[in-house]
């Protein structure tokens, strides 16, 4: 019997083994090892409100001989992280992004959880807790999400007047900030239907449609319509703003006032004329319901409805109704005031 195997037969014997090795190498890659020292968080999304205290959990299962823990915030729409705090387990150094409102919880020696006091609108976003031990770094990511309300905003000059930077400033002037895509999506799931496109914080331009119709994106499926990439300096749209719970209180003063008289009336009560974001927050979180139009600080006249009824808004859904921007000298409305507690 010959001791050699013909080449074709040898290839046939080798092929199944080679295919098995190839399948294991490419089809079933080894799983990426998870964190060795950091425990995975029980909740990756932490919910909070403006003015509250939020805790972002980061706990070590065991302590390496030498290490540092680095907290940073991942900026939306940008490929960079902003440093917040570094600790070596004994001492911590604050880098000032949160203005001294950030500290470590230190519930025990393996606790590196981050506490953020007096949460602000700009604190919402994605955070990273990174363990640096000089051998193999590892990290966990968490998202701080604020409860709030998204509202469309345009100036007295009419629709599509803002470039990106003007839209950002306009929201801040109305006690808000530009909404993120996730905030707009959440508002859409809660009933926001709006045909005018507006800037978002990431620099995109979108609008939410619940009832698809010809003059509002066409007869397609409901969803978030997108205008694609836009020039932040040249292109002009409205703004979608986001605000959260208030530290103070919104109240209505009846009368037939001009805008300047409205400012005087609120000042006499130790308050200021409310901003648009104040009114939306009071409607959302305090259930403010009033059929009377009132002046706001931007010169618009609006009123909040939580229980729609005849001759009180004329629309079936709750929300903040607008009379637009009447002449400031027109003495026909009361005013909504805002007072800090």
UniProtKB/Swiss-Prot annotation:
Return the SMART domains for the record: IG, IGc2, IGv, LINK
Tissue-level expression reads: Brain.
Q: Where in the cell is it found?
A: Secreted, Extracellular space, Extracellular matrix
Q: Which Pfam families match?
A: V-set, Xlink
Where do the Link domain residues begin and end? 149-243, 246-339
Q: Which GO terms describe its biological process?
A: cell adhesion; central nervous system development; establishment of blood-nerve barrier; extracellular matrix assembly; skeletal system development
Name of this protein: Hyaluronan and proteoglycan link protein 2
User: Can you name the source organism?
Assistant: Rattus norvegicus
